[in-house]
């Protein structure tokens, strides 16, 4: 029988000399409950947790294969966790009265996003021990976490008369933890109108070859919060090592970025005018649009 040793080339096959592991777990769940109410109302609750966890380890024992060797055992382990929760409460209304059609939505949503990272490493582990906490030399650990939340009030009203004249109005009020309290909330309205000319009585003779002729126009304000977390305040970074002048290291901390408490929602004003046309049982379709977009802040 040949036994691998730390100086034998066969030793590289020994899992006690080098070991790397990677484990990842993900779970995405979409839960909902819906209740129909009188008079055309309906209530719906959506709950969507999105969870992930990752753990990686890397271990090297002492070995010597000539040109390739490792004099001190070492190990590194890191863990990463991400949780994203979204809860929505939606109340809708949908009714038709003769030629009048009305639908409406009122909702509230809350989203929480949290991530956490942990890293630990060290050298000089006792023989047969693969726990980074047992390291006797150059022990180091680092950890950070960040969290953000978004709350939204959503409303929308749609009205149509005889499928000829259409209007939709929406309003959102969003609050983001990425901004300071005085700039936390943004207000984003929009309105759009449409005219189905092909449904007018004076277009009756054209229906044999024209299926659709619709004019539409819209104006709205969109909000954008896609920035890094905590930009409105000063973030301290720790676990920074400095030489002590005697061959050792001193742990310290320093401000990572300059605070900007004036940062706020980016707003984009959009204006759109368009036309939709369809001919010969929709064999030929034409769509034209004119846009104007203005972004500020």
Regions found by a protein language model. Give the residues of each.
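Extracellular/periplasmic, surface-exposed regions of secreted and cell-surface proteins
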Residues: 2-60, 70-297
């Amino acid at each position: 029988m040949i036994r691998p040793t730390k100086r034998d080339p066969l030793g590289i096959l020994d899992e006690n000399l080098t070991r790397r592991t990677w484990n990842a777990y993900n779970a995405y769940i979409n839960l909902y409950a819906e209740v129909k109410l009188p008079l055309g109302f309906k209530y719906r609750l959506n709950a969507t947790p999105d969870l992930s966890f990752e753990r990686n380890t890397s271990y090297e024992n002492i070995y010597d294969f000539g040109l390739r060797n490792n004099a001190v055992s070492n190990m590194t382990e890191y863990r990463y966790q991400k949780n994203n929760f979204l809860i929505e409460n939606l109340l809708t209304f949908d009714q038709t009265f003769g030629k009048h059609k009305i639908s409406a939505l009122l909702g509230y949503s809350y989203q929480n996003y949290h991530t956490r990272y942990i890293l630990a490493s060290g050298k000089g582990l006792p023989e047969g021990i693969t726990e980074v906490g047992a390291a006797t030399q150059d022990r180091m650990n680092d950890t950070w976490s960040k969290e953000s939340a978004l709350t939204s009030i959503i409303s929308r009203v749609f009205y149509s008369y005889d499928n000829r004249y259409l209007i939709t109005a929406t309003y959102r009020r969003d609050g983001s933890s990425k901004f300071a309290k005085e700039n936390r909330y943004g207000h984003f309205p929009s309105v759009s109108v449409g005219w189905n000319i092909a449904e007018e009585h004076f277009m009756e003779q054209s229906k044999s070859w024209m299926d659709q002729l619709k004019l539409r126009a819209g104006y709205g304000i969109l909000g954008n919060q896609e920035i890094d977390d905590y930009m409105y305040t000063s973030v301290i970074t720790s676990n920074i090592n400095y030489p002590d002048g005697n061959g050792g290291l001193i742990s310290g901390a320093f401000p990572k970025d300059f605070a900007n408490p004036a940062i706020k929602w980016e707003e984009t004003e959009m204006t759109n005018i368009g036309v939709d046309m369809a001919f010969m049982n929709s064999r030929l379709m034409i769509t034209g649009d004119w846009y104007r977009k203005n972004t500020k802040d």
